[in-house]
Curated annotation (Swiss-Prot):
Keywords: Acetylation, Electron transport, Heme, Iron, Metal-binding, Methylation, Mitochondrion, Respiratory chain, Transport. Belongs to the cytochrome c family. This is Cytochrome c. Its main location: mitochondrion.
Amino acid sequence: ASFAEAPAGDAKAGEKIFKTKCAZCHTVZKGAGHKQGPNLNGLFGRQSGTTAGYSYSAANKNKAVAWZZBSLYDYLLNPKKYIPGTKMVFPGLKKPZZRADLIAYLKASTA
C-alpha cells in the first residue's frame, strides 16, 4: 500500500513514536548536531546521503532518493530492504498508521 492509501497522520502520535523509536539516534532541531544517525532537520525534499557533516554509507549516497512522504513511507516499512547496506539498524514500522503518524510529525518538526 502507498502513502496515498495510508490513514491521515497524527503529528502528536508521531512525536511519541519519534521519542521512543527514533530520538536515540536522530535529532530534528535546526542546528542540532548529529547522533548515531543524521539530524533530520530539512529532511523533506533532500536527497538521501547528503546532510553536511554526517558520514553516510555508500548505499545511502548511491540510492539518491528524494525524501518525500511517499519515499519515507516505503523506507520506514523496512529500511534495510529499501536501501540495502544502510547503516540504520532500525527494523521499521510495520503499521501504516504509525508510519503516517511519524511522517506527520517529521513534516511539522523538520521544516
